[in-house]
Protein backbone atom coordinates (compact mmCIF):
# COMPACT_ATOMS: atom_id res chain seq x y z
CA UNK A 1 0.00 0.00 0.00
CA UNK A 2 1.42 3.38 -0.99
CA UNK A 3 0.82 6.69 0.72
CA UNK A 4 -1.57 7.56 -2.15
CA UNK A 5 -3.86 4.61 -1.44
CA UNK A 6 -3.78 4.45 2.34
CA UNK A 7 -7.17 4.71 4.05
CA UNK A 8 -8.32 7.74 5.98
CA UNK A 9 -7.01 7.75 9.54
CA UNK A 10 -9.34 9.26 12.12
CA UNK A 11 -8.58 10.04 15.76
CA UNK A 12 -11.78 9.59 17.74
CA UNK A 13 -11.03 12.03 20.53
CA UNK A 14 -11.70 15.60 21.62
CA UNK A 15 -8.37 15.75 23.48
CA UNK A 16 -5.88 18.32 22.15
CA UNK A 17 -3.11 16.32 23.85
CA UNK A 18 -3.91 13.14 21.92
CA UNK A 19 -4.07 15.21 18.74
CA UNK A 20 -0.63 16.67 19.46
CA UNK A 21 0.81 13.22 20.16
CA UNK A 22 -0.58 11.75 16.93
CA UNK A 23 0.76 14.70 14.92
CA UNK A 24 4.28 13.67 15.99
CA UNK A 25 4.01 10.72 13.60
CA UNK A 26 3.72 13.10 10.61
CA UNK A 27 0.94 11.11 9.00
CA UNK A 28 -2.30 12.65 7.75
CA UNK A 29 -5.29 12.24 10.04
CA UNK A 30 -8.66 13.73 10.82
CA UNK A 31 -10.26 14.28 14.20
CA UNK A 32 -13.83 13.40 15.16
CA UNK A 33 -15.41 13.55 18.60
CA UNK A 34 -17.29 10.39 19.61
CA UNK A 35 -20.59 10.75 21.42
CA UNK A 36 -20.75 7.85 23.88
CA UNK A 37 -21.74 7.26 27.49
CA UNK A 38 -18.48 6.97 29.44
CA UNK A 39 -20.07 5.78 32.68
CA UNK A 40 -18.34 2.67 34.10
CA UNK A 41 -20.55 -0.39 34.32
CA UNK A 42 -21.46 -1.76 37.76
CA UNK A 43 -18.68 -4.05 38.98
CA UNK A 44 -16.51 -3.35 35.94
CA UNK A 45 -12.76 -3.56 36.53
CA UNK A 46 -10.74 -0.44 35.62
CA UNK A 47 -8.84 -2.00 32.70
CA UNK A 48 -12.10 -3.39 31.30
CA UNK A 49 -13.68 0.08 31.48
CA UNK A 50 -10.80 1.67 29.57
CA UNK A 51 -10.76 -1.07 26.91
CA UNK A 52 -14.53 -1.00 26.46
CA UNK A 53 -14.65 2.78 26.12
CA UNK A 54 -11.74 2.91 23.67
CA UNK A 55 -13.55 0.40 21.46
CA UNK A 56 -16.91 2.18 21.77
CA UNK A 57 -15.28 5.46 20.72
CA UNK A 58 -13.70 3.81 17.67
CA UNK A 59 -16.96 2.08 16.72
CA UNK A 60 -18.98 5.30 17.05
CA UNK A 61 -16.69 7.12 14.63
CA UNK A 62 -16.25 4.15 12.27
CA UNK A 63 -20.03 3.96 11.84
CA UNK A 64 -19.89 7.43 10.26
CA UNK A 65 -16.73 6.92 8.16
CA UNK A 66 -16.83 3.76 6.04
CA UNK A 67 -13.46 2.24 5.19
CA UNK A 68 -11.43 4.40 7.58
CA UNK A 69 -8.93 3.36 10.21
CA UNK A 70 -10.26 4.77 13.48
CA UNK A 71 -8.30 5.28 16.69
CA UNK A 72 -10.21 5.14 19.95
CA UNK A 73 -8.53 5.69 23.29
CA UNK A 74 -9.48 6.04 26.92
CA UNK A 75 -7.61 6.36 30.18
CA UNK A 76 -8.60 5.19 33.64
CA UNK A 77 -6.63 6.03 36.78
CA UNK A 78 -6.66 3.53 39.64
CA UNK A 79 -5.46 3.33 43.22
CA UNK A 80 -5.88 0.07 45.13
CA UNK A 81 -7.84 -1.20 42.09
CA UNK A 82 -10.47 1.54 42.52
CA UNK A 83 -11.17 3.95 39.68
CA UNK A 84 -10.25 7.57 40.26
CA UNK A 85 -12.27 9.63 37.81
CA UNK A 86 -12.25 13.19 36.58
CA UNK A 87 -12.78 15.36 39.66
CA UNK A 88 -14.88 18.14 38.15
CA UNK A 89 -14.28 20.50 41.09
CA UNK A 90 -11.37 21.95 43.02
CA UNK A 91 -12.41 20.27 46.27
CA UNK A 92 -12.67 16.82 44.69
CA UNK A 93 -9.35 17.29 42.88
CA UNK A 94 -7.62 18.22 46.14
CA UNK A 95 -9.09 15.16 47.86
CA UNK A 96 -7.83 12.94 45.01
CA UNK A 97 -4.31 14.33 45.19
CA UNK A 98 -4.24 14.04 48.98
CA UNK A 99 -5.21 10.38 48.63
CA UNK A 100 -2.52 9.70 46.00
CA UNK A 101 0.42 11.61 47.47
CA UNK A 102 3.35 9.37 48.37
CA UNK A 103 1.64 6.41 46.69
CA UNK A 104 1.84 4.60 43.36
CA UNK A 105 -1.12 4.93 41.03
CA UNK A 106 -1.80 2.88 37.88
CA UNK A 107 -3.01 4.54 34.70
CA UNK A 108 -4.67 2.23 32.17
CA UNK A 109 -4.24 3.81 28.72
CA UNK A 110 -6.47 1.74 26.45
CA UNK A 111 -6.18 1.86 22.69
CA UNK A 112 -8.35 0.50 19.90
CA UNK A 113 -7.55 0.65 16.18
CA UNK A 114 -10.64 -0.31 14.21
CA UNK A 115 -10.11 -1.11 10.52
CA UNK A 116 -13.26 -0.06 8.69
CA UNK A 117 -12.19 -2.05 5.62
CA UNK A 118 -12.18 -5.40 7.43
CA UNK A 119 -13.95 -4.80 10.73
CA UNK A 120 -10.84 -5.97 12.61
CA UNK A 121 -10.30 -4.29 15.97
CA UNK A 122 -6.89 -4.32 17.65
CA UNK A 123 -6.97 -3.41 21.33
CA UNK A 124 -4.35 -2.92 24.03
CA UNK A 125 -4.12 -1.71 27.62
CA UNK A 126 -0.80 0.01 28.29
CA UNK A 127 -0.23 0.42 32.01
CA UNK A 128 1.79 3.20 33.57
CA UNK A 129 2.74 3.11 37.25
CA UNK A 130 3.21 6.64 38.57
CA UNK A 131 4.52 7.35 42.07
CA UNK A 132 3.38 10.68 43.45
CA UNK A 133 5.58 12.96 45.52
CA UNK A 134 4.56 13.54 49.12
CA UNK A 135 3.57 17.18 48.62
CA UNK A 136 1.96 19.48 51.17
CA UNK A 137 -1.67 20.56 50.98
CA UNK A 138 -0.48 24.08 50.11
CA UNK A 139 1.57 22.75 47.17
CA UNK A 140 -1.32 20.64 45.92
CA UNK A 141 -3.70 23.60 46.20
CA UNK A 142 -1.26 25.86 44.32
CA UNK A 143 -0.91 23.27 41.54
CA UNK A 144 -4.68 22.99 41.19
CA UNK A 145 -5.16 26.77 41.03
CA UNK A 146 -2.46 27.09 38.35
CA UNK A 147 -3.39 24.08 36.21
CA UNK A 148 -7.15 23.55 36.89
CA UNK A 149 -7.00 19.86 35.83
CA UNK A 150 -10.62 19.16 36.71
CA UNK A 151 -11.25 17.25 33.47
CA UNK A 152 -8.26 14.90 33.95
CA UNK A 153 -8.49 11.46 35.51
CA UNK A 154 -6.79 11.62 38.88
CA UNK A 155 -6.27 15.41 38.58
CA UNK A 156 -2.78 14.77 37.20
CA UNK A 157 -2.30 16.77 34.01
CA UNK A 158 1.16 15.40 33.29
CA UNK A 159 1.47 17.15 29.93
CA UNK A 160 1.62 20.36 31.98
CA UNK A 161 2.41 21.19 35.60
CA UNK A 162 1.19 17.79 36.75
CA UNK A 163 4.59 16.34 35.90
CA UNK A 164 5.85 18.06 39.07
CA UNK A 165 3.50 15.90 41.15
CA UNK A 166 5.40 12.77 40.16
CA UNK A 167 8.48 11.19 41.65
CA UNK A 168 8.75 8.19 39.33
CA UNK A 169 7.06 6.74 36.24
CA UNK A 170 7.28 3.19 34.89
CA UNK A 171 5.78 2.28 31.51
CA UNK A 172 6.54 0.38 28.32
CA UNK A 173 5.35 3.39 26.32
CA UNK A 174 6.45 6.92 27.25
CA UNK A 175 3.42 8.58 25.65
CA UNK A 176 0.84 6.35 27.35
CA UNK A 177 0.56 8.56 30.43
CA UNK A 178 -0.51 11.52 28.29
CA UNK A 179 -3.25 9.37 26.79
CA UNK A 180 -2.13 7.94 23.43
CA UNK A 181 0.46 5.12 23.50
CA UNK A 182 2.33 5.72 20.24
CA UNK A 183 4.51 2.60 20.39
CA UNK A 184 1.41 0.41 20.60
CA UNK A 185 -0.41 2.50 17.98
CA UNK A 186 2.37 2.32 15.40
CA UNK A 187 2.53 -1.45 15.89
CA UNK A 188 -1.21 -1.64 15.23
CA UNK A 189 -0.93 0.56 12.14
CA UNK A 190 1.84 -1.64 10.75
CA UNK A 191 -0.28 -4.74 11.41
CA UNK A 192 -3.11 -3.09 9.44
CA UNK A 193 -0.74 -2.49 6.53
CA UNK A 194 -0.69 1.26 6.99
CA UNK A 195 2.53 2.82 5.60
CA UNK A 196 3.70 4.85 8.58
CA UNK A 197 6.70 6.24 6.70
CA UNK A 198 4.63 7.12 3.66
CA UNK A 199 6.25 4.53 1.38
From Swiss-Prot:
Gene3D superfamilies assigned: 3.90.950.10
GO cellular component, one term: cytoplasm
Keywords: Cytoplasm, Hydrolase, Nucleotide metabolism
Chemical reaction(s) catalysed: N(7)-methyl-GTP + H2O = N(7)-methyl-GMP + diphosphate + H(+)
EC number: 3.6.1.-
Residues flagged as site, Important for substrate specificity: 17, 75, 159
Cofactor requirements of the protein: a divalent metal cation
Entry similarity comment: Belongs to the Maf family. YceF subfamily.
Name assigned to this protein: 7-methyl-GTP pyrophosphatase
Species name: Cupriavidus metallidurans (strain ATCC 43123 / DSM 2839 / NBRC 102507 / CH34) (Ralstonia metallidurans)
